[in-house]
Curated annotation (Swiss-Prot):
Transcription recorded as keyword: no
SUPFAM superfamilies: F1F0 ATP synthase subunit A
GO molecular function, one term: proton-transporting ATP synthase activity, rotational mechanism
One Pfam family hit: ATP-synt_A
Protein name, entry field: ATP synthase subunit a 2
Keyword Thylakoid: yes
UniProt source species: Crocosphaera subtropica (strain ATCC 51142 / BH68)
Oligomer and partners: F-type ATPases have 2 components, CF(1) - the catalytic core - and CF(0) - the membrane proton channel. CF(1) has five subunits: alpha(3), beta(3), gamma(1), delta(1), epsilon(1). CF(0) has four main subunits: a, b, b' and c.
Length: 251
């Protein structure tokens, strides 16, 4: 009886609720678009454009301030692309890999540094763009299109010969691999960012002052790592598509 009375008392207490998965849809004809994802993505793109304009508005021979920081970022991205693609192939793909990294990095950090939930919208709530599976799948599909394009532009139709090398029995496995690559990229990024934001949101709700701060710092670190992993794997997949047999033997 004592236990039953205790359960009845618990039933009368208000429960904390944290809703996820609600979306504000924009209807364009027969299409339904996730409005809050577009809004958050535009904010991230605007931040990147503003940073670029600030860094290039007064270019100096001896860089300082914002220009110095942006040159460091560009040097980091160049080294990242060159490491994955090699000296011979990295230049045409540097803009793609650099854009991937910067968009994902700023999106991930915006989830911790921008108070999205304070901005009211008709339905759902704003969050980091990479907190939505649609964004991460779109980025992964872009990566898939990039390495297919890289392989076809480098080898022509001979690119498809890779599917039956070294033995034809590997054909089903290599076709399956083309589906698992974007899936693994998208779900890894989505799962890490969503989990980080949910943990911080719950702790802020329960203990709203100092306890969430270390987790927020850890979240910033893991968010940067996720951006690096995504860009690194994208470069590795593109290099795999364009690498010739002679280069493999030389390596």
């Amino acid at each position: 009886m004592t236990m039953l009375n205790g359960l009845r008392i618990l039933d009368t207490l208000p429960l904390a609720a944290l809703e996820v998965g609600k979306h504000w849809y924009w209807e364009i004809g027969n299409l339904k678009l996730h409005g809050q994802v577009f809004m958050a993505s535009w904010v991230v793109i605007a931040l990147l454009i503003i940073a670029s304009l600030l860094a290039t508005r007064n270019i100096q021979r001896v860089p300082s301030g914002m220009q110095n920081f942006m040159e460091y970022v560009l040097e980091f991205l160049r080294d990242l692309a060159r490491t994955q693609l090699g000296e011979k192939h990295y230049r045409p793909w540097l803009p793609f890999i650099g854009t991937l990294f910067l968009f994902i990095f700023v999106s991930n950090w915006s989830g911790s540094l921008i108070p999205w939930r304070l901005i009211e919208i008709p339905e759902g709530e704003l969050a980091a763009p990479t907190n939505d599976i649609n964004t991460t799948v779109a980025l992964a599909l872009l990566t898939s299109l990039a390495y297919f394009y890289a392989g076809l532009s480098k080898k022509g139709l001979g690119y498809f010969a890779n599917y039956v090398q070294p033995i034809p029995v590997l054909l089903p496995i290599k076709i399956l691999e083309d589906f698992t690559k974007p899936l693994s990229l998208s779900f890894r990024l989505f799962g890490n960012i969503l989990a980080d934001e949910l943990v911080v949101a719950v702790l802020v709700f329960l203990v709203p002052l100092f306890v969430p701060l270390p987790l927020m710092a850890l979240g910033l670190f893991t968010s940067a790592i996720q951006a690096l992993v995504f860009a690194t794997l994208a470069g590795a997949y593109i290099h795999e598509a364009i690498e010739s047999e002679e280069e493999e033997e030389h390596a």
